[in-house]
Design a protein with these regions (language model features):
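Short beta-strand elements
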Residues: 1-29
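Beta-strand/loop-rich accessory regions of lumenal/periplasmic or secreted enzymes
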Residues: 20-315
Length: 315
């Protein structure tokens, strides 16, 4: 018997309610203004760094990807880096600028191609927000014309690297506890779930099978904490319908005729996606129903585009 669950808050409203008490605890008695002086922007020939009293984040000037995240209290490195990198689309950095704004350190990256802009904002309390605007123009400019997305979209979003060896588990709010595919979402229910890391390969694992499988796509993210003895962090969704991809499941080595049982996963290790692929069963995807088919993107002048907004807590 499956008990259905339904969300009663949009992701951005839920996030607002979650952050208010945390920010109040971080700055009691109106001490926010005092902390603001500790937030600043630093530049070298190759890097732009956003620094607060709690967290320091450095970006490459060449492509606006994260090169390092440091927790200032203990100097610990959080190895989420080498992103955001486009998945299912193309984007090329056109302009990069940094500034102070209302006490926050802000980095604004503008792109040609499928992405319009990604704005990073580091608040004095150490929370880092990412606001991405995607697919809001019919022409990507700079020779892209409209050829800046995959013809058939399997995965669409942004991806980062994070070493699998650092992760011991995940606690998250969203659909769970099982991983999903585009045509395997019903049955995964909203809730707060916990999974310890495992590398279960159904049909092949010789050791004890541990379920739910840890790696894969997770639907309707509200927040997730990647647990680690050395480098934990939490990410919150401020946009609805985001899929969280966690690492890449291994294919069974003894699969029939060596054929892959799963569609290709995005590059990187941790991805935030607006679309994911279906998984086939006996028949090719082209012979499955409409909910299994790859996405097709059509953009018209005046479209608002898609938003992929996140908040990272590295403290």
């Amino acid at each position: 018997v499956c008990t259905r669950t339904f969300p009663i808050h949009y992701a951005k409203d839920y996030l607002k309610g979650e952050l208010q008490p945390k920010r109040a605890d971080a700055h009691p008695s109106g001490s926010q203004s005092a902390a603001a002086s500790n937030c600043r922007v630093e530049e070298t020939d190759t890097l732009i760094t956003l620094r607060s009293s709690a967290v320091t984040v450095s970006f490459r000037k060449s492509d606006a990807t994260i090169t390092s995240v440091t927790r200032n209290a203990d100097g610990r490195i959080i190895p989420l880096k080498d992103g955001p990198v486009a998945v299912g689309m193309k984007m090329v950095l056109a302009d990069l600028s940094a500034r102070m704004e209302n006490g926050d350190a802000v980095l604004c990256a503008r792109y040609r191609g499928a992405a319009d802009s990604i704005v990073w904002r580091l608040a004095p309390d150490g929370l880092l927000s990412m606001d991405a605007v995607l697919l809001n123009r019919a022409s990507g400019g700079g020779g892209f014309d409209d050829a800046f997305t995959d013809t058939e979209v399997l995965n669409l979003g942004l991806t980062f690297s994070y070493p699998e060896s650092e992760c011991s588990g995940m606690r998250w709010m969203g659909r769970g506890p099982y991983r999903v595919w585009k045509n395997r979402i019903p049955g995964a229910n909203y809730g707060v779930w916990q999974k310890d890391y495992n590398n279960t390969i159904t049909g092949e694992s010789t050791e004890r099978l541990v379920y739910p499988e840890f790696k894969g796509y997770h639907a309707n993210l509200y927040w997730a904490t990647l647990q680690s003895s050395t480098a934990p962090f939490t990410v919150y969704a401020a946009s609805d319908g985001i899929f969280l991809r966690v690492f890449t499941p291994e294919e069974p080595h003894g699969r029939q005729d060596g054929l892959n049982t799963m569609p290709d996963f995005p590059a990187g290790d941790i991805s935030f996606l607006l679309d994911i692929p279906a998984i086939r069963c006996f028949k090719p995807i082209s012979q499955h129903g409409p909910q299994s088919q790859p996405g097709i993107i059509r953009i018209k002048k005046g479209d608002e585009g898609l938003r992929l907004n996140l908040m990272f807590d590295f403290r």
